[in-house]
Amino acid sequence: MPRTFEEECDFIDRLTDTKFRIKKGFVPNMNVEGRFYVNNSLEQLMFDELKFSCDGQGIGGFLPAVRQIANVASLPGIVGHSIGLPDIHSGYGFSIGNIAAFDVGNPESVISPGGVGFDINCGVRLLRTNLFEENVKPLKEQLTQSLFDHIPVGVGSRGAIPMLASDLVECLEMGMDWTLREGYSWAEDKEHCEEYGRMLQADASKVSLRAKKRGLPQLGTLGAGNHYAEVQVVDEIYDKHAASTMGIDEEGQVVVMLHCGSRGLGHQVATDSLVEMEKAMARDGIVVNDKQLACARINSVEGKNYFSGMAAAANFAWVNRSCITFCVRNAFQKTFGMSADDMDMQVIYDVSHNVAKMEEHMVDGRPRQLCVHRKGATRAFPAHHPLIPVDYQLIGQPVLIGGSMGTCSYVLTGTEQGLVETFGTTCHGAGRALSRAKSRRTITWDSVIDDLKKKEISIRIASPKLIMEEAPESYKNVTDVVDTCDAAGISKKAVKLRPIAVIKG
């Protein structure tokens, strides 16, 4: 017999002002406990979702996030805790905003496409400029239109980068080294990119022909949904040393934020792998609490093939953001009549928030090789970590947090506490509060546009009918999310950004 909401809550208790525990027994076969980070307002959303589920009200076909965190805690080989971040919301298998790490040395350990997501290496890139708001304001509409003209956006958009099938194979394996060779990126760009823009484990032969066909025309495209290019202004600086190290010197400075991923190619890689993993589960006797948690042993043929294909899709996403960066620099050059170099359009950083990585972490006092799944979660390594660029060794890895449309975004830095508690991971954005369907039912197109106009934000949209899905009301408050992570000590606020122009698919 299903438990009541009150009975469910008996398995959940508060550990600190920002951290809750999900005890073993909440769902069957939990190998570790669950943890999730929320403040008071985000806590209400989490428990309301669980209550609606107990009352028989659906949440878009997915289980509530609390239950998904617990189900992930039951996967074979998981270590530490199954962790939910403040922007968490229900997703396929894993919640978006769920982290889980699996011991590579344990032959039972698994890798799960649901722990990465369908948009492999969906991520964020931030470019700085030496322009200020007063320089851009007179040309803001012209710049917005130029960006819209230069960057292919929307469902089914085709890329501006000419590519042969042989080029695609190279970019899947070379990542940003391909864009550097072809002249689409600067040598400095890859130095400020997670994995330096290339996962070396990538194998293009593990990407299906169908996935390649989907990706071939989409290189250099933004796509639709919550993907965007934004011109932003530095609104507030919290950590002057960190900001200065990133080339952000004062309020009013103009930056550009890009949010996109691996397009149809990554989606197809995930779809293909789920079929293979279901076969592997039947063969190896792997039992999971939710069929959406399809997985395979990390060291099985299926597990290795998925990881190699996922790495190739991740490389495609870095190439995609690099090609869009090329388009952005061209749009700025056309608008302002200066070279991108003269405008100091350097990449501050590029982060992934949908990926699995092989990393070394301390577990029970000793180093272990782990497969860390980050779905809707951003790597946030601290100062002096060997995997972050030399330029950021003294401040920690920059972490880019995009807000919802028309709201602020943030730059954070990683912390030692985050490395200990969350495998060096923090939030990735605002996180949905309403389903896309409910957003379309309850929010009007006019109200969204009027709100942006009141904020003096220029906008260009390829798919106006989808704009209601991306309205700020559809998302959690990004400031709540970031402040919760800051209060919990898993990341530290450095800079707040506000948008002045938005390009959306």
Curated annotation (Swiss-Prot):
Residues at which Mn(2+) 1 binds: 119, 122, 227
Any one GO molecular function term: GTP binding
Gene3D superfamilies: tRNA-splicing ligase RtcB
Resulting phenotype, residue 122 to A: Abolishes ligase activity and is unable to provide a neuroprotective role in degenerating dopamine neurons
Catalytic activity: a 3'-end 3'-phospho-ribonucleotide-RNA + a 5'-end dephospho-ribonucleoside-RNA + GTP = a ribonucleotidyl-ribonucleotide-RNA + GMP + diphosphate; a 3'-end 2',3'-cyclophospho-ribonucleotide-RNA + a 5'-end dephospho-ribonucleoside-RNA + GTP + H2O = a ribonucleotidyl-ribonucleotide-RNA + GMP + diphosphate + H(+)
EC number assigned by the record: 6.5.1.8
UniProt GO BP: germ cell development; IRE1-mediated unfolded protein response; tRNA splicing, via endonucleolytic cleavage and ligation; vulval development
GO cellular component: cytoplasm; endoplasmic reticulum membrane; nuclear envelope; nucleus; tRNA-splicing ligase complex
Effect of a null allele: Mutants are sterile and few are viable. Mutants have a slower growth rate, reduced lifespan and have defective vulval development displaying a severe protruding vulva phenotype. Mutants have disrupted RNA ligase activity which results in the presence of unligated tRNAs and defective tRNA processing. RNAi-mediated knockdown results in reduced sensitivity to tunicamycin-induced endoplasmic reticulum (ER) stress and significantly reduced levels of spliced xbp-1 mRNA under tunicamycin-induced ER stress and non-stressed conditions.
Assembly and oligomerization: Catalytic component of the tRNA-splicing ligase complex.
PANTHER family, A to Z: RNA-SPLICING LIGASE RTCB HOMOLOG
Family in the record: Belongs to the RtcB family.
The protein's name: RNA-splicing ligase RtcB homolog
Organism from which the protein derives: Caenorhabditis elegans
